[in-house]
Regions:
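Edge beta-strand at a domain terminus
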Residues: 120-122, 130-144
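Cleaved targeting-peptide boundary
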Residues: 21-30
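C-terminal/domain-terminus segments
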Residues: 42, 102-122
Length: 144
């Protein structure tokens, strides 16, 4: 009987450790699904955000001039470079997910509501309009 109680306690402790997740577990550098950008996710005050730290096509044809955020709907932001643009903002952690955030897509200049879910070394990032039902999920990989 003592062995059963001990084994049950060990199993419960192990399962709790496996299924519990730190809110900061999402922090780090991620490679997007297309493998053409790396995004660093960090904590800003009590929320999580992410900025572009590398892109495959960072420069214009001349190889020197950094590409700009030319498709941004806000004309005042079109002159900023793609590098270091904050594309994830406002995420809060709730029960294994990062929710209530926004994701900006510099390829089309649009911002969407977003949520994220961590699964091992992959991050499911869902952008949507209105309800999460009406959206698209991409899977990012953690960069070691």
């Amino acid at each position: 009987m003592k062995k059963i109680i001990t084994l049950t306690a060990i199993l419960f402790t192990s399962l709790t450790a496996v299924f519990s997740q730190s809110p900061d577990a999402v922090r780090g550098v991620w490679l997007n699904e297309n493998k053409d950008a790396k995004i660093e996710i960090y904590k800003a005050a009590d929320k999580y955000a992410g900025k572009i730290v590398w892109t495959k096509d960072m420069y214009e044809a001349d190889g020197k001039t950094q590409k700009k955020d030319s498709k941004n709907s806000n004309e005042n932001l079109r002159s900023r470079t793609i590098l270091n643009i904050v594309i994830l903002s406002g995420f809060t952690y709730d029960d294994g997910e990062w929710i209530d955030g926004e994701i900006y897509d510099p390829k089309n200049g649009k911002t969407y509501k977003s949520k994220m879910k961590l699964k091992g070394n992959t991050l499911e990032v869902r952008g949507y309009i209105g309800s999460p039902m009406f959206g698209k999920t991409t899977v990012w990989s953690r960069v070691s």
